[in-house]
Amino acid sequence: MCIRDSVGTGAGFPGLPLRICLRNIELTLLDSLNKRINFLQEVSKQVGIDNIEFIHGRAEDFGKLEEYREKYDIATARAVAGLPILMEFCVPFVKVGGYFVCLKGPNANLELEESKAAMDVLGVEFIEKINIELPESDLNHNILVFKKVKNTPDKYPR
């Protein structure tokens, strides 16, 4: 299985914990800040995890490249942008039949409503919303799961 932690991997979540738990996956981490990529390379070396591709760049650039476009089983993202924009950055990486999984906050239902046109254009269907309750926190976290059902038009991401 090939997973891309596509947009703003930051400190490596959820990519690095997934790779630690699931040793058989291939993982690609993409971030626009080289210092984050350098940090993640050092962390993975110290922890002893391999089979990770680190990319310094932007999703909107790499999502257009044939070697990355529609090649991944799963793309993940944290809540770094509104859902329609996040989908535009991530969905082009996912192969048909694969999944886009993202973390969203308390406005997840509203963002889903605002994303219906983007879902249709980008070729994904909404599958599930998983509510996450964290101990000692009153914050509302949601994991949204989408399945890619058709190829994304070449003009995306813009």
What are these regions (language model features)?
Residues 11-24:
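Conserved SAM-binding loop of SAM-dependent methyltransferases across substrates and taxa
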Residues 22, 94-96:
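Helix-to-beta-strand junctions that scaffold the AdoMet/dcAdoMet cofactor pocket
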Residues 30-31, 103:
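The conserved SAM/SAH-binding core of class I Rossmann-like methyltransferase domains
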Residues 72-87, 91-92, 106:
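A short SAM/SAH-binding and catalytic strip from SAM-dependent methyltransferases
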Residues 106-158:
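Active-site capping/gating segments
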Residues 1-5:
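Conserved small/polar residues in nucleotide/adenosyl-binding loops
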Residues 30, 37-70:
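S-adenosyl-L-methionine
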Residues 97-107:
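Conserved beta-strand signature within the Rossmann-like core of class I S-adenosyl-L-methionine
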